[in-house]
């Protein structure tokens, strides 16, 4: 068998000399250059200030939610358990992208090694897909709470919640591993300028020096599975929720149910809408400037919405924050 392979290989170069020249001139890429916002010149300094402020708001908001949910026993419910997991995932999700982007806004050298680029894409997609799946699970949690309140303790027991959270994380990172393998198994010859502020799929795969149709098709199928399927599941859940809410006799009960669901639905629409715009289309249709603005939405604006809209405006969370701060204040006075 090895002899046959060697013979075939030698014949290929004998009958097709251009392939030999191509192989000799092939230079594999060892690092990428992240162009980011370099075309904006001096505006980058203003962007640095804005993005740094937003990053600190995201970080402080998520840390506050995680801490309050952990410290206040009244929030030890499935809904807030998943909120805490989502906030944790969002914290790491932004940490993978934003610090490097902030550094690049102030530096001339914007290089990232081949391996670091692959790792950045792996963790970014891992946490992003985990968030998508978590939003789907949270939709199911609201469906179980509103449509089946009597069976809710059984449907969303702590054991079930733990398994669902673990399934989201495992599914997210397995899907990410599949996509990253499809991207970085491609040959990258000479072009190394990534027209983006991080190693995103479309921007990197455009640099491959071979046909990428099969890889792109499989990545598209993965995108459908992690974006369209959970979104449709959420839509069906909310149709059932809406039907149940309309049957609630009291106006206060309907208002409270609508308020809880509306905050979740607003985050879902922004997150899935922006992600679908970027990933559920061929790479050939990638338009860098427009796509970069949309990417900013789901890498910065959506993580900003989660703590502000979904949790900090929630009366239970606000009350819990006051209780936690009140306890700390009383402890200081006592000491």
Swiss-Prot record:
This is Olfactory receptor 10R2. It comes from Homo sapiens (Human). InterPro entries: GPCR_Rhodpsn, GPCR_Rhodpsn_7TM, Olfact_rcpt. Disulfide bonds join 117-209. Residues 1-45, 96-119, 181-217, 279-291 are extracellular. The keyword Transmembrane helix applies. Residues 67-74, 141-159, 238-257, 313-335 are cytoplasmic. GO terms for cellular component: membrane; plasma membrane. Belongs to the G-protein coupled receptor 1 family.
